[in-house]
From Swiss-Prot:
GO terms for molecular function: 5S rRNA binding; structural constituent of ribosome. GO terms for cellular component: cytosolic large ribosomal subunit. This is one of the proteins that binds to the 5S RNA in the ribosome where it forms part of the central protuberance. Part of the 50S ribosomal subunit; part of the 5S rRNA/L5/L18/L25 subcomplex. Contacts the 5S rRNA. Binds to the 5S rRNA independently of L5 and L18. GO terms for biological process: translation. This is Large ribosomal subunit protein bL25. Pfam families: Ribosomal_L25p (PF01386), Ribosomal_TL5_C (PF14693). The gene is rplY. Belongs to the bacterial ribosomal protein bL25 family. CTC subfamily. The keyword Transport does not apply. SUPFAM superfamilies: Ribosomal protein L25-like. It comes from Chlorobium phaeovibrioides (strain DSM 265 / 1930) (Prosthecochloris vibrioformis (strain DSM 265)). The keyword rRNA-binding applies.
């Protein structure tokens, strides 16, 4: 899994502080680890967007102003309900040998025979939660859709074990992840005949 560096600025939580941070082009966030005190920080919105809106998961080295670097991953992201901008983020710290739960993006490879026949590919789960050591976490979970016909569904239990070796998928094995559905058939409706002209009133 790729590791990237993200600068953070410690902050003191005050009234209306979060809104001021957002107006300055940054995002309020917290950094936490089990058994440690939670630290309030802010991060650059543009840099954070690059990490959140990506097809791959990342290990993030949070760099503090004093030069300290703490290894983390994004645990939670809150979006504005209207603008869809990131309004808050949680970073979870971890040790190299620590077992964590992390959301990993789902990606597909291959050309589906069902799609070639006019079917539509649907990715039903864009992320799956994996449990294991950080060093074993993949950038994404790859699903080969080559043999998927119209009506085919790939469930969690169908994902090859080598895609997540030494890891556990923390979701019901029967959960559908990818499917190929039949195209919608548009039903042609005949135009209703024009209504007969109303008889003229007698003089």
């Amino acid at each position: 899994m790729e590791t990237t560096v993200l600068g953070v600025q410690p902050r003191i939580i005050k009234k209306n502080d979060a809104e001021k941070i957002r107006k300055s082009g940054n995002v309020p966030a917290v950094v936490y680890h089990k058994g440690e005190e939670t630290v309030a920080v802010s991060v650059n919105e543009l840099e954070l967007n690059k990490l959140v809106h990506t097809a791959e998961s990342h290990i993030i080295d949070l760099r503090f102003p004093d030069g300290k670097v703490k290894r983390s991953f994004i645990k939670a992201v809150q979006f504005h309900p209207v603008t869809d901008r990131i309004i808050h983020t949680d970073f979870q710290l971890f040790a190299a040998d620590e077992v964590i739960e992390m959301d990993v993006p789902v990606s597909v490879t291959g050309e589906s025979v069902g799609v070639d026949k006019g079917g539509k590919l649907q990715i039903l789960r864009h992320n799956l939660t994996l449990k294991g050591k950080p060093t074993d976490m993949p950038d994404h979970l790859v699903i080969d859709i080559t043999d998927m016909e119209i009506g085919s569904i790939v469930h969690v239990k169908d994902i090859p074990a080598q895609s997540y070796e030494n890891l556990e998928i923390m979701i019901d094995p029967e959960t559908p992840v990818v499917s190929v559905v039949a195209p919608k058939v548009e039903v042609e409706t005949e135009e209703a005949p024009e209504a007969a002209a109303a008889p003229e009133a007698e003089a």
